[in-house]
Regions:
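Positively charged, low-complexity intrinsically disordered leader regions
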Residues: 2-15, 20-60
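Short catalytic helix/loop segments, enriched in acidic residues and glycine
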Residues: 58-78
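Alpha-helix C-terminal capping segments
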Residues: 68, 76-87, 109, 338-341
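Conserved N-terminal subdomain of the carbohydrate kinase-like
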Residues: 87-179, 374-387
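Hydrophobic faces of well-ordered beta-strands that scaffold small-molecule active sites
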Residues: 90, 206-208, 240
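Catalytic-core regions built around general acid/base machinery
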Residues: 190-203, 228-236
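Conserved phosphate/ATP/ADP-binding segment of small-molecule kinases
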Residues: 215-309
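Conserved post-catalytic alpha-helical subdomain immediately downstream of the catalytic base
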Residues: 296, 312-381, 385-387
Length: 387
């Protein structure tokens, strides 16, 4: 079945950089950022899910639920469109039933262009758009997340489902995918690899968020399978996102005990970078958030990025967290925006750090921030009332 490409393309906000491919800021070395123009600033590939959220009430005691549309790969596209004004698209599975209608409406409302491989629902069993169940926790009570991904349409996606030469031939500056989609099935991982090859052939930057999810990988062969799949994909990327735990669990990199280290100490992460670039010489930039969890609603928050032998660390802020889900995707979006806009490594990391923090102050998985709020926080702004 041929994919459906639909939805308006919004005009992008003017980037800071000028025309012509350029290195993404001082210290980011050989990461050549395509100039503005073309059809899309970013194309994401991944599954889209419905998250049912009872707030701070444990799920088993809930009487009401908020519905969020989410997905690690989709969230990045949604954040870049809604907050940063970039032209983005999501290549994903769509099911022709009312849940699909809800998801489609939310995708378009965020300003993201949908590119669908459509599936017909049989009225009883599926295929389905996956459901994620969560409660936010509170104080000393941690958040809880579990899934129903039975007969998930996104897991049926396979090479050949999308016309990558046509999509990238219209000029896409950045391609993004992640470990959550890669974990769904053998065919979903193969589809990412197919898209990455097409992206490179067209001159797009390729990024991968490791986003290791043990519960999902357990259904697809566990860590050994993750190492095999994610290792193949990491070999094809320019920008790798993930902390030291992701590097160990998803890629099998040896490293110090994550539990024993401070969440704010970048040394464990930076100490593993030499291994990363030795094993994956194509990787030019690696970045992650750093956090120390004091309680469910109070975190110390920082971030670190490495590019071509240079590392930068964001300041540490005390962050009041409303809904933790989506903060990492908010970080990824801020980083990509900064790099596409011609920012240097430190400025791009600051934008990522600021936007990721802001996303955790809203309900749901995607941004409600404005670019002005992100820039203000990145510069060291405060929560004083704006009049």
């Amino acid at each position: 079945m041929a994919p459906e490409a639909s939805g308006p393309s919004r005009p992008a906000r003017a980037p800071a950089g000028g025309a012509g491919a350029r290195a993404a800021g001082e210290g980011s070395g050989a990461l050549a950022v395509p100039p503005p123009g073309g059809a899309l600033d970013l194309l994401s590939l991944g599954g889209v899910v419905v998250r049912l959220d009872p707030g701070v009430v444990p799920f088993g005691k809930a009487r009401a639920l908020d519905i969020h549309v989410s997905g690690g790969e989709y969230n990045v596209a949604a954040n870049l469109a809604s907050c940063f004004g970039l032209r983005t698209a999501i290549a994903t599975a769509m099911v022709d039933y009312p849940v699909g209608d809800l998801v489609d409406e939310r995708i378009r409302a965020m300003g993201v262009r949908p590119i669908y491989r459509r599936f017909a629902h049989d009225g009883v069993r599926g295929p389905n758009i996956a459901t994620v169940y969560s409660d936010r926790g509170y104080g000393v009570r941690a958040p809880v997340v579990f899934y129903n991904r039975a007969d998930e349409a996104a897991a049926r996606l396979a090479p050949g489902d999308f016309d990558w030469p046509a999509l990238f031939g219209a000029r896409v500056r950045w391609f993004h995918s992640g470990g959550i989609f890669a974990a769904l099935s053998e065919s979903s991982a193969a589809l990412i690899a197919e898209a990455m090859a097409a992206a490179h052939a067209a001159g797009a930057i390729v990024s991968l968020d490791l986003n290791y999810r043990g519960k999902i990988w357990a259904a697809e062969g566990g860590q050994a399978r993750a190492h095999e799949v994610m290792g193949r994909l990491a070999a094809q990327v320019d920008v790798l996102l993930g902390n030291e735990e992701d590097l160990q669990a998803a890629l099998g990199m040896p490293g110090p005990s994550v539990a024993a280290a401070s969440g704010l100490d970048p040394s464990a992460f930076l100490g593993m970078i030499e291994q990363v670039v030795a094993r994956y010489p194509r990787v030019k930039l690696v970045a992650t958030t750093l956090r120390e969890v004091h309680s469910t609603n109070r975190h110390a928050w920082s971030a670190v990025a490495w590019a071509e032998g240079r590392s930068v660390v964001a300041p540490t802020m005390e962050l009041d967290v409303y809904d933790r889900v989506g903060g990492g995707d908010g970080f990824a979006a801020g980083l990509i925006y900064g790099l596409l806009s011609g920012a240097g490594l430190e400025e791009a990391l600051r934008l990522a750090w600021a936007h990721g923090a802001l996303v955790t102050t809203y309900p749901g998985d995607t941004t409600m921030a404005t670019l002005e709020q992100v820039q203000s926080l990145a510069r060291g702004g405060s929560a004083r009332i704006q009049r």
